[in-house]
Amino acid sequence: MSSRVLTPDVVGIDALVHDHQTVLAKAEGGVVAVFANNAPAFYAITPARLAELLALEEKLARPGSDVALDDQLYQEPQTAPVAVPMGKFAMYPDWQPDADFIRLAALWGVALREPVTAEELASFIAYWQAEGKVFHHVQWQQKLARSLQIGRASNGGLPKRDVNTVSEPDSQIPPGFRG
């Protein structure tokens, strides 16, 4: 087990117990690493050094300027989880599968390696919103699992090609043809 000792002064626990005042007085920075069984156990620190460190911590905790920014700028708005309607319902824009969707899909015989992406979910919701059909929440999840299984397997598991890329012909001549 590796460890990092944060002071050059090292002493055994027995020496510290025997005469702690002398050990701390000889410590270069007011701090001593105490070892027990050939491994660092804790640090012993003088009251003066502790006061210095606490003052430094307090100074660093204060802002460097008197300009304060509104905390709302840094916090993402928390959206309340949408309650799933009871019984059958038509697909709606904020519908989400359960948090353990991948596990449930496996129970239904659909092995999904990756969670549903935002694009896949948006496509699924848009399609079924237009259809206007009504199903239970579990049935919607089963439909999503099957849709993902079919959509991801349609290209042999490879990502879909970008239709905007220019293809590059190869320069290989198949056997039996002259070049």
Swiss-Prot record:
Record carries keyword Metal-binding: no
One Pfam entry name: DnaT
Domain of life: Bacteria
Disordered, as annotated region: 156-179
GO cellular component: primosome complex
Keywords: DNA replication, DNA-binding, Primosome
Gene Ontology terms: biological process: DNA replication, synthesis of primer
Cysteines paired by S-S bonds: none
Membrane-spanning intervals of the chain: none
NCBIfam families tied to this protein: PRK02854.1
Subunit structure of this chain's protein: Homooligomerizes. Interacts with PriB. Component of the replication restart primosome. Primosome assembly occurs via a 'hand-off' mechanism. PriA binds to replication forks, subsequently PriB then DnaT bind; DnaT then displaces ssDNA to generate the helicase loading substrate.
Similarity comment: family membership: Belongs to the DnaT family.
Its job: Involved in the restart of stalled replication forks, which reloads the replicative helicase on sites other than the origin of replication. Can function in multiple replication restart pathways. Displaces ssDNA from a PriB-ssDNA complex. Probably forms a spiral filament on ssDNA.
Name of the featured protein: Replication restart protein DnaT
Naturally occurring in which organism (per UniProt): Escherichia coli O7:K1 (strain IAI39 / ExPEC)
